[in-house]
């Protein structure tokens, strides 16, 4: 207690009383003392944070640590999931590989943490909690010894002063000696403690490089852990990729075409082949195919099924529009169009060429530059569209209509521009590219093609009303035979013709027209198709498509669809004098004043215009006449002619020309009056221009009361004279030429333009629109009529009068 009291008093004297204070440490050691405290703080905080980074339980054995490790728990979960899903699935295989990898990573993590704990965390703990506190403890002990020494010195000095004034020297001297010995002993203790403290401080300074190595070891251990982990990951990653690449069930929508073909090992994209094959089974005669929008839910479901490479053909055969919509969606969602961005400018430039032959040649050149994968798929698709166009009389999808609805899905610019421009100019240019390719599919892509390449889309055993698609009817089938299955198979979303038929039976044609509904006769399309072969046979050789550079020596395959059965293989002989002597009369009776329709009111030439001349390149000579027993009772193969009557709107006037000058449009050409509307304010390349002064006669007969044209007196009485027009119509470009055939190559081309102009009156306007108007047409027989016996003449007159009376009574009832 006395020693403690003396220390306190000495400390107070040094602090307040300005007593002498002995400093036993050098300046360097004082700096080391300050640094000790800073190092202690840093080491303590670092140790605390490193300990928090450890995921395992600190201080436990390796087995116990691994059970508490999150990576180990994750690995166990993945392995259990793999066992549940099974190794036969892609997801199960992925879970198994990842589970094994995570388990190995967990073991590496355990080794890493054990080494960090041993080489870094524990040394830092010793430094912060043991070594530096020991040095600081010695420093405090030295301070106490210094206070003891100073206190002894102070007391000895006071005793020495007081002994000099005292009379009795003996007791004072003995006390002074005792204090002096105490002072010397305290000084010795201070010296020893100071030396020890100095040694510890210098040792700490010398060991600073070892303390820095702790952090170097931390980085090295981490680097080694991550290297081993990376090695594990790099080893398992190729296995994972191999499993995924071996799994062929990958999405195809929105993926590049080359990637999809490479993964699936196919030449034709799966969605394209699947949709085309299904449409061949159940959609070739579907009206408005590719144009009628399908159900959104069905379309979404079918796209998802195609992504999974699983398609229920039987389910979707009832709705061909969903299949067509899926095909359009796949083409549009491709990152690059099927006709490529690289060739976009070349396609557009080719479409801008005015001359038909050069435009076709430019399109062919661009087509040959397509990459192999794109070329194979566009060839497959165009061949299908060409086959689909053979049924255009039923499905109403001409090459022009197909180009309108599919063109923007096959080619579009890489940079998105103004939406208005995209919908007008660019769309029309693309239509001008796709349409001739469809029309001349066999010229652009010669040879036959097998649509069901993989053989995995067989005809389903339909249990629904689509069973009649097992064999698709010919376009030339009788409309009455085709109408029943067509009406039965169509989905309710587009089955409107049945409703129109019921309206027609109950309320009559006038009431339907008063409702603003355009009524079309579905039987005329088959009759139009039956004369397609005769039209194609009259194409002059001067209008043949240019031969590709590689095929100039060989005859080109015909782009025409397969000829219909009833088309004559050779032109018929000329009409008899009685049939050929029909000439136009000076005057044309008004339709409103007579129930007899003039044969020139809707036809492109006189009744003998085709029979009276031979097609260029054909040989004139006697031809074997068809036996009457082989011909239908009401038609002659040489004398079928069309006289068109239009219900609404009024067709443009076509002038009467002399016989032997007009060759009809080839079968491969589309109807210029597109069923789909062209973009607004954009001139259509196939548009019709009406004369400004053209209007319907005020007294024209209604369609319901129009007389039949079976009476031969119509042709023996007055013939038509074309009506003058204020100004001639603009002449559009000629229809695309047809490829040459072997039988036509030997003859010289004959011009069909000058005789047509010669046969016109000065007031008449001439049109070279060799087109089909989308209006009902009625076949009129000339040859058979002119050769009728009087008995047959009278019988047909009676039938005609009966029909007239029936239609008049119906019109009166309406």
From Swiss-Prot:
Residue segments, region Disordered: 467-493, 531-768, 784-814
For bias kind Basic and acidic residues, which ranges apply?
479-489, 790-805
What single Pfam family name could you report for this chain, choosing any that match? BAR
**GO cellular component, as recorded:** dendrite; dendritic spine; glutamatergic synapse; leading edge membrane; plasma membrane; postsynapse; postsynaptic density; presynapse
Annotated BAR domain ranges read 14-249
The principal location of this protein is other
Residues under site feature: Arginine finger: 291
Superkingdom of source: Eukaryota
Annotated domain remarks:
Rho-GAP domain is required to promote GRIA1 exocytosis from recycling endosomes. Rho-GAP and BAR domains are necessary for the control of long-term potentiation in hippocampal neurons. In dendrites, BAR domain mediates the recruitment to patches where plasma membrane is deformed by acto-myosin mediated contractile forces.
Q: What is this protein called?
A: Rho GTPase-activating protein 44
Origin organism of this chain? Rattus norvegicus
Top-level taxonomy = Eukaryota, Metazoa, Chordata, Craniata, Vertebrata
């Amino acid at each position: 207690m006395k020693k403690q009291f003396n220390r306190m008093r000495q400390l107070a004297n040094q602090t307040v009383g300005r007593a002498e204070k002995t400093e036993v440490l050098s300046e360097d050691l004082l700096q080391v003392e300050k640094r000790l405290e800073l190092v202690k703080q840093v080491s303590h905080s670092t140790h605390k944070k490193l300990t928090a980074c450890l995921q395992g339980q600190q201080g436990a054995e390796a087995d116990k640590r691994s059970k508490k490790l999150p990576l180990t728990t994750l690995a166990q979960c993945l392995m259990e999931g793999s066992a549940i899903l099974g190794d036969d699935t892609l997801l199960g295989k992925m879970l198994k590989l990842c589970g094994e990898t995570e388990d190995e990573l967990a073991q590496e993590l355990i080794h890493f943490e054990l080494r960090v704990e041993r080489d870094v965390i524990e040394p830092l703990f010793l430094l912060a909690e043991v070594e530096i506190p020991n040095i600081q403890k010695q420093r405090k002990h030295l301070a106490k010894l210094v206070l003891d020494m100073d206190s002894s010195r102070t007391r000895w000095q006071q005793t020495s002063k007081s002994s000099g004034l005292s009379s009795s020297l003996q007791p004072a001297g003995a006390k002074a000696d005792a204090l002096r010995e105490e002072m010397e002993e305290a000084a010795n203790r201070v010296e020893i403690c100071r030396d020890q403290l100095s040694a510890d401080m210098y040792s700490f300074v010398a060991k600073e490089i070892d303390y820095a190595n702790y952090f170097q070891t931390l980085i090295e251990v981490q680097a080694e852990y991550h290297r081993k982990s990376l090695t594990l990951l790099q080893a398992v990653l190729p296995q994972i990729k191999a499993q995924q690449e071996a799994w062929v069930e990958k999405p195809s929508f929105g993926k590049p075409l080359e990637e999809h073909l490479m993964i699936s090992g196919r030449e034709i994209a799966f969605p394209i082949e699947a949709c085309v094959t299904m449409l061949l089974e159940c959609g070739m005669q579907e009206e408005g195919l590719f144009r009628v929008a399908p159900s959104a839910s069905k379309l979404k479901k079918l796209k998802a099924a195609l992504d999974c490479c699983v398609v229920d053909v039987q389910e979707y055969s009832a709705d061909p529009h969903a299949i067509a919509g899926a095909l359009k969606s796949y083409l549009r969602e491709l990152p690059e169009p099927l006709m490529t961005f690289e060739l976009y400018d070349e396609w557009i430039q080719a479409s801008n060429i005015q001359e038909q032959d050069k435009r076709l040649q430019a399109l062919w050149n661009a087509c040959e530059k397509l990459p192999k994968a794109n070329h194979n798929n566009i060839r497959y698709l165009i061949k299908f569209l060409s086959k689909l166009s053979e049924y255009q009389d039923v499905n109403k999808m001409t090459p022009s209509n197909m180009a309108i609805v599919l063109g923007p899905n096959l080619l579009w610019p890489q940079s998105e521009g103004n939406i208005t421009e995209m919908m007008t100019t660019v769309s029309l240019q693309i239509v001008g590219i796709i349409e001739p390719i469809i029309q001349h599919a066999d010229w652009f892509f010669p040879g036959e093609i097998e649509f069901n390449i993989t053989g995995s889309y067989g005809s389903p055993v339909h249990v629904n009303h689509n069973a009649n698609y097992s064999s698709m009817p010919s376009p030339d089938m009788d409309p009455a035979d085709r109408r029943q299955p067509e009406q039965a198979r169509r989905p309710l979303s587009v089955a409107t013709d049945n409703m129109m038929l019921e309206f027609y039976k109950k309320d009559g044609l006038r009431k339907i027209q008063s409702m603003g509904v355009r009524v079309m006769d579905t039987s005329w399309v088959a009759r139009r198709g039956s004369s397609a072969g005769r039209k194609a046979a009259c194409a002059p050789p001067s209008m043949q498509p240019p031969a590709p550079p590689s095929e100039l020596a060989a005859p080109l395959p015909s782009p025409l669809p397969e000829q219909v059965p009833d088309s004559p293989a050779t032109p018929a002989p000329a009409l008899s004098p009685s049939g050929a002597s029909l000439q136009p009369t000076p005057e044309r009776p008004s339709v409103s004043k007579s129930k007899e329709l003039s044969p020139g009111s809707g036809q492109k030439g006189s009744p003998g215009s085709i029979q009276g001349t031979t097609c260029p390149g054909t040989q004139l000579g006697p031809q074997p006449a068809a036996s009457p027993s082989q011909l239908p009772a009401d038609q002659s193969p040489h004398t079928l002619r069309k006289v068109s009557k239009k219900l609404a709107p009024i067709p443009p006037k076509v002038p009467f020309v002399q016989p032997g000058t007009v060759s009809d449009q080839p079968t491969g050409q589309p109807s210029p009056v597109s069923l789909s509307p062209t973009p607004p304010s954009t001139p259509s390349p196939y548009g019709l221009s009406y004369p400004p002064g053209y209007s319907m006669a005020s007294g024209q007969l209604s369609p319901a009361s129009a007389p039949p044209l079976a009476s031969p007196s119509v042709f023996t009485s007055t013939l038509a004279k074309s009506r003058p027009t204020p100004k001639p119509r603009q002449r559009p470009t000629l229809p695309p030429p047809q490829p040459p055939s072997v039988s036509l190559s030997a003859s010289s081309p004959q011009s069909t333009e000058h005789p047509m102009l010669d046969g016109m009156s000065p007031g008449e306007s001439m049109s070279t629109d060799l087109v089909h108007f989308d209006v009902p047409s009625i076949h009129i027989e000339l040859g058979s009529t002119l050769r009728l016996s009087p008995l047959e003449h009278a019988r047909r007159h009676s039938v005609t009068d009966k029909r007239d009376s029936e239609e008049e009574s119906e019109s009166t009832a309406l």
